[in-house]
Amino acid sequence: MYKILKSTPNGIDELELEQLEKGCWIDIVSPSPEELHEIAAATKIQLDFLTAALDEEEKSRIETEDDQILILVDIPFLRSNKDYDTLPLGIIIAEDFIVTVCLEPNAVVADF
């Protein structure tokens, strides 16, 4: 699932993929392969960058390729048994978009 958000003078608008425009934030959570391919095609963001945070064992790092930057960090995540664990959060900075990718909904991104 994903949400596309755009800041406007009246607040924050949620857009459809067909309405994607420069300056949007795409927040991706537990996406299907089809959704990832749609977003990659619409944004020209590398599929490898979009899928990096979907591997629970992925290590934190910064990677650059062309005009895109991938920042991968581990964030705290509360498991159902009340134990904390970590999950990768991918932050992709592209020329026209910012994208966040995570396996689970999380408080880090929800605060925005």
Over which residues does each language-model region extend?
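Peripheral, non-transmembrane regulatory/ligand-interaction domains of membrane transport proteins
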Residues: 1-112
